């Protein structure tokens, strides 16, 4: 009798685990996926690492001045930085949220590329894919 009781408990446990698994799978399948971020129609890309060097040493003042002028023209700046931007400005890595705070833009409008990624390629792809203009001193080829 004890062996039957142990077997029933084992079966009940397996059924319980299977039930939990099915519920989790169904719950995951029914979740609504967020829509991909869209680029605003009035967007313009700013080569942040390039612009902050206008006039010599890296400067947030120069960059924010350019960004303010862009927003005064009712354009939405999308700023792309090299991964080394934080080291150049603050001596340490800065992610997109930190850069957004420093320059006063929404984090969704800032992109710090990963180490080893060429920011210019990201800028050109973004511009070409979305028909956007770029603010930079670089000669993209």
Which residue ranges define each predicted feature?
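Noncatalytic, typically N-terminal accessory segments of nucleic acid-processing enzymes
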Residues: 1-135, 140-141
């Amino acid at each position: 009798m004890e062996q039957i009781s142990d077997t029933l408990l084992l079966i009940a446990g397996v059924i319980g685990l299977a039930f939990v698994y099915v519920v989790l799978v169904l719950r995951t399948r029914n979740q609504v996926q967020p829509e991909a971020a869209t680029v605003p129609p009035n967007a313009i890309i700013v080569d942040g690492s390039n612009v902050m060097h206008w006039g010599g040493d890296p400067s947030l003042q120069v960059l924010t001045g350019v960004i303010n002028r862009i927003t005064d023209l009712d354009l939405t700046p999308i700023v792309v930085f090299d991964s080394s931007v934080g080291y150049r400005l603050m001596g340490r890595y800065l992610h997109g949220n930190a850069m957004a705070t420093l320059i006063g833009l929404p984090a969704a409008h800032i992109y710090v590329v990963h180490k080893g990624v060429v920011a210019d390629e990201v800028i050109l792809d973004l511009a070409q894919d979305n028909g956007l203009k770029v603010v930079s001193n670089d000669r993209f080829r």
